[in-house]
Amino acid sequence: MINKHFSSEEIEQDGKSCLLKNARLGVLGGSGLYSIDSIENIKELDIETPYGKPSDSLRIGNLGGMEVVFLARHGRHHIYTPTEIPYRANIWALRSLNVRWILSPSAVGSLQEQVRPLDMVVPDQFIDRTHQRPLTFFCDGAVAHVTMADPFCPTLSRLLAEEGELLMPEARQVHKGGTYLAMEGPAFSTRAESQLYRSWGCKVIGMTNHTEARLAREAEIAYTSLSMVTDYDCWHEGFGNVSVDLVIENLAANAKLASKIVEATAKRISKLLPPSEAHTALKNSLMTSKDKVSETTREKINLFTENYWGKFNK
């Protein structure tokens, strides 16, 4: 049921760009976005990974002229907290289905006055304040250090922001760039924490994107976020504190628009097949010699290392 994964050897160089053959677009839907109605000819796959089961079935279909794989990160019935999401299983499953780009529509709180509820942000940096999650595939005797200087793919982010600006109502705004503060959750911030993150210059606060971005980079998948602003966290004296009701209300108002932006971006990706530095992220990142890595670990990470270490056979 699962197609052969897409390796860097299948990238054709033409001197200016590279053609990614048969690659798919992944969409990781967050709170309030558990499906995209415009995806056609959907087939569902249940995949078992070396890291357990993903959050939900993976739905493969057509959107914007290309094949996409949709996955609800919290599960379609929202059963996983941000800490409990099986991030490694999700990213492994997407890569096993030839996903080489990921768009991540996600709920966030605003940490800056000018970034208003119902605006959207395409961040370009993050600060990680989580402490309970596995953040790498490379452990248990295999070490890799990928570059995370630019954690969100600049090319993918530009396409997403451009399509967002075209579709956004005049009263709202798409903000290009900014730092995403990643908190553990599931509780929202204290007022002191919210003010601290503001003093750092962070633009939005969320609970999931940085974990996905790290793992996607190791999996050589280009990743970017469409951060949908639902509230002002708890720092703004002129607005009520963030609550589940407020988040859900504003997400419902933004869900259709976010789906349209994702579809429009998918159309751009299907035409451009944009290359990304993320697609060869492991090229100069693998530290451990393959002959020093156990068979168990080699088998788990073979999906990512085959192009550099050769195919693993027991």
UniProtKB/Swiss-Prot annotation:
Q: What class of enzyme is it?
A: transferase
The record's Gene Ontology cellular component field reads: cytosol
Give the GO biological process terms.
L-methionine salvage from methylthioadenosine; purine ribonucleoside salvage
Q: Which UniProt keywords apply?
A: Glycosyltransferase, Purine salvage, Transferase
Report the Pfam families cross-referenced here. Answer: PNP_UDP_1
**Per the UniProt record, which EC number(s) apply here?**
2.4.2.28
Pathway(s) of this molecule? Amino-acid biosynthesis; L-methionine biosynthesis via salvage pathway; S-methyl-5-thio-alpha-D-ribose 1-phosphate from S-methyl-5'-thioadenosine (phosphorylase route): step 1/1
Superkingdom classification of source: Bacteria
Residue numbers binding substrate: 207, 231-233
Residues of the site described as Important for substrate specificity: 189, 244
**Record-linked Gene3D superfamilies:** Nucleoside phosphorylase domain
Q: Which family does it belong to?
A: Belongs to the PNP/MTAP phosphorylase family. MTAP subfamily.
**Binding partners and assembly:** Homohexamer. Dimer of a homotrimer.
What is the name attached to this protein's record? S-methyl-5'-thioadenosine phosphorylase
User: From which organism does this entry originate?
Assistant: Prochlorococcus marinus (strain SARG / CCMP1375 / SS120)
Name of the gene: mtnP
